[in-house]
Amino acid sequence: MHNTTKRVTVPALEAMLYETIKVLDHGFIRVIDYMGDDSSIVQAARVSYGKGTKQLNQDKGLINYLLRHYHTTPFEMCDIKFHIKLPIFIARQWIRHRTASVNEYSARYSILGNEFYLPEPTDIASQSAINKQCRAGDSLPKKVSEKVLAILEEDARRCYMHYKELMNADEDGNIIDENVAGIARELARMNLTLNYYTEWYWKINLHNLLHFLRLRTDSKAQYEIRVYAGKILDIVKAWVPFTYEAFEEYRLQGANISRKGLEVIKRMIQGEKVIHETSGMNKREWEELVKIFR
């Protein structure tokens, strides 16, 4: 192994390589490899052979400009590869982001470990009455949460017991009963609950990673995937700090406003009192606009 390299490296990210970052109860994120840094974005934008200018404020200003004006290609010059362990039901949400290279642990070839996710009691809530895709904000009473957790754990343990019974093999692949024929792993796996953990390698460029983070760190995203996204956001901050600052400024803490929304703001600036009924916006649009300025 060479001890030196000519490629761009980031000391803060080098220190994170292969380190296990714990997520949820049994999950983790590990940075396996990366390519590029903030200077790579600047270099691509200027189509030069150097590392941009010698003045960091100019590089930072260019990155701000690129992100503010929705340039994409320069950010695609940076790549990062993760090793991630996550519950299957979160993996199925995650994989909807189809702009990454993924290789997942195969339960056809191997036996899944006996590890499953159980939420904290405070994270168990009823269905939201106003949003069809997420839970309500308030936790359920302690007695109800304890019952929910007991059911989730009981079902997971029972299903794993049947999983091993169907294969006639233990967690390490050893035959349980020589007189019994087990079924194929690819069939036995269908009995497992979605809170069991899977693992994958996930490689993505910075542009698409930022899109993933914008959606999955949002308060409307499911709590469990938000936890993973938050950890990855911290990694991005260490990897490309200028890009992170621009991303926070223009995406995470910024806002998109519609044409009607801009017209309402202009009317308000001119001294007009505008309410929902006179705004020309539907109820949801109006509430989203008002929320921006609260």
Curated annotation (Swiss-Prot):
The family database entries (InterPro entries) matched by this protein are listed as:
Thymidylate_synthase_ThyX (IPR003669), Thymidylate_synthase_ThyX_sf (IPR036098)
This entry's Enzyme Commission designation comes to: 2.1.1.148
Report residues binding dUMP: Q93, W94, I95, R96, E104, Y105, S106, A107, R108, R189, R216
Q: Enumerate the cofactors the protein uses.
A: FAD
Q: In which pathway does it act?
A: Pyrimidine metabolism; dTTP biosynthesis
Known catalysed reaction(s)? dUMP + (6R)-5,10-methylene-5,6,7,8-tetrahydrofolate + NADPH + H(+) = dTMP + (6S)-5,6,7,8-tetrahydrofolate + NADP(+)
Q: What does this protein do?
A: Catalyzes the reductive methylation of 2'-deoxyuridine-5'-monophosphate (dUMP) to 2'-deoxythymidine-5'-monophosphate (dTMP) while utilizing 5,10-methylenetetrahydrofolate (mTHF) as the methyl donor, and NADPH and FADH(2) as the reductant.
Protein name (Swiss-Prot/TrEMBL): Flavin-dependent thymidylate synthase
Q: What is the lineage of its organism?
A: Bacteria, Pseudomonadati, Pseudomonadota, Alphaproteobacteria, Rickettsiales
